[in-house]
Design a protein with these regions (language model features):
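N-terminal auxiliary segments of SAM/dcSAM-dependent transferases
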Residues: 1-24, 33-38
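Short glycine/serine/threonine-biased micro-segments
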Residues: 22, 32, 42, 64-68
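Short, isolated positions in well-ordered beta-strands
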Residues: 27-29
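Conserved SAM-binding loop and adjacent beta-strand
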Residues: 32-52
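Conserved SAM/SAH cofactor-binding pocket of Class I
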Residues: 45, 49-110
Length: 110
């Protein structure tokens, strides 16, 4: 059984769209088999985002280490207009994150 942090090229593609709202803004992310939380925005990520977005101090830059398909970096870039750098070991997740950056009209280095 593959883990999301492995680059398992034998997995069958099952592309899908994840839709969610944070801070009253809508997001759509491309997802696929072989990535973390491929079916939905996981509870931990939702709680993390809702918590950090309440902070008054907004960072001018951030590193999204283990970005997956990009929900944290994308939401934080849109909310904070911060310089965002995203990185992940999973090649499929990185390709999806690149697509999600473009489709959510944010700027990030990945």
């Amino acid at each position: 059984m593959s883990q999301y942090f492995e680059n398992d090229k034998t997995l069958q593609d099952k592309p899908q769209i994840l839709s969610f709202q944070i801070n009253g803004k809508s997001y759509r992310l491309h997802s696929n088999s072989g990535v973390f939380s491929k079916d939905k925005l996981d509870t931990g990520t939702r709680i993390l985002l809702e918590t950090v977005l309440k902070e008054e101090d907004r960072p001018s830059s951030m590193l999204d280490l283990g970005c997956g398909i990009g929900p944290v970096g994308i939401v934080c870039q849109r909310e904070w207009n911060a310089q965002v750098t995203m990185i992940d070991i999973n090649e499929k997740a990185v390709e999806l994150a690149k697509k999600n950056i473009v489709e959510n009209h944010v700027q990030a280095n990945i």
